[in-house]
């Protein structure tokens, strides 16, 4: 996909995936508008990382939207009374780190922003293969949201739709890490951990998936 001189709103959380999408867009010479959310999550480490990534890639604009999903909780990421799981991802079971409706809300806000600034794309770091099985990170969800987006705004109705761009959707975490380094993402400045300690916990699902993939990528890199 040719992104040169195209405007793109990237949902930039500060994690590895969204930072990689930002890096790919930057290398493609797109005009990047970053959007993060202070949504009542357990910590603000990822927002700090998002700000660092936005500055690193010198994007056009970076906004942090206040939207408090902790008002009703429903997830261990927005409710401190729920424990973050450390026993691993269970097959065919959605973990309690899933935040009800989060991606639907965030992409809807991004769609409004994109339409207001006449952006061509919304960049998402969702990937379906080795993440936690969230329902709003899957190909069928992205396909249906695109259909909704095409009906829900002026550009879509005028046959000039804003497209959801998901370059990582079918990649595993090792492949994403390779892309991150290939696109000059400051890997050590991204934040994936569910906890807000000074250093990543190394125990939560997100840490373990990231660390295992990094070790695999590094081993393969050193063999070459």
Curated annotation (Swiss-Prot):
EC nos: 6.3.4.20
Keyword Protein biosynthesis attributed: no
Ribosomal protein recorded as keyword: no
Binding site for Zn(2+): 193, 201, 204, 207
Catalytic activity: 7-carboxy-7-deazaguanine + NH4(+) + ATP = 7-cyano-7-deazaguanine + ADP + phosphate + H2O + H(+)
Binding note for cofactor: Binds 1 zinc ion per subunit.
Pathway involvement of the protein, from the record: Purine metabolism; 7-cyano-7-deazaguanine biosynthesis
One function term, GO molecular function aspect: zinc ion binding
Residues involved in ATP binding: 12-22
InterPro entries to which the protein is assigned, alphabetical: QueC (IPR018317), Rossmann-like_a/b/a_fold (IPR014729)
Cofactor: Zn(2+)
Protein's recorded name: 7-cyano-7-deazaguanine synthase
